[in-house]
Amino acid sequence: MYKEFGIKEEVISLAEKINKDLLPIFDEIDKNCELNSLKVLKAFNKYNVSDMHFNSTTGYGYGDVGRDTIENIFSEVLGAEDSLVRGQFISGTHALTVALFAFLRPNDTMLSICGKPYDTLDEVIGIVDNDSSLKSYGVKYEQIDLINDDFDYDKIIDRVSKNDIKLIEIQRSRGYALRRSITLDKIEKVIKAIRSVNKNVIIMIDNCYGEFVDKVEPLALGADVMVGSLIKNLGGGIAPNGAYIAGKKELVKLAAERLTAPGLGKEVGPTMGINKYILQGLFMAPSVVASSLKTAIF
């Protein structure tokens, strides 16, 4: 069968051998996939998803039952108090920008404990000068670099214990850096360390590329809020655009009022026909993520 595509027998034999060697790892990925698929299915059942939720709204988008149901489902699946899931988010970077501008005020300090975030956030934060950056509004930025792909726990504890940090950002994915992605056990460890000296700092996870990779999401480990893109994992390759912010209710409210307007928040936002694709994408996402992981490991 493969010969007509120019694939040699020795390549096929090697691939079969590698597949056998990787079976234990693939089995673990399949277990995660099954668990996350059941989470999604349970949420769909809980909120009685039907074709009525595929309906489209235009204009202001008041009373969009599908949109509100999608946000309830995301909250259920991600373990969040509330969620903001919108096609009005252009990208993960846009959602992160909305979150940062929602949570931070002039003279607040943001601390990244994974070194410098994505390049696309350079001008958002003010690492690269921009008149619309957080820096231009008086928000201060600090970073603590990783050590051998792990957190610098001592330096983090020392800095956070001074109680003048408003928000800590953890970028789960490697992004454009050469480091490894941050595993959940390390995220759990650093959150516990932070909470041992500071109960009030906002811990925000950039969860892009991290959803459904493991059995739980960072909110279950003590993070306050997380942000991700529907163009990536949770969109399942089907959602045409959008992103989400999920976590504590008061933080999601702030983010919603930054995306729309104070006093409007989550009440508005036309979906213009994407509800069906977001729901389909989420339903398929555990399988799509599992396949992606297997391909990357292979």
Which functions belong to the PLM regions below?
Residues 67:
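N-terminal pre-P-loop "Q-motif" helix
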Residues 74-79, 87:
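Extended, compositionally biased flexible segments
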Residues 2-19, 23, 30, 40-46, ...:
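Conserved PLP-enzyme active-site core in the AAT-like
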Residues 51-60, 71, 84-87:
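Flexible, gly/proline-biased loop segments at the beginnings
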Residues 81-85, 230-232:
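A short glycine/serine-rich beta->alpha loop
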Residues 298:
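Glycan-recognition surfaces in beta-rich domains, encompassing non-catalytic CBMs
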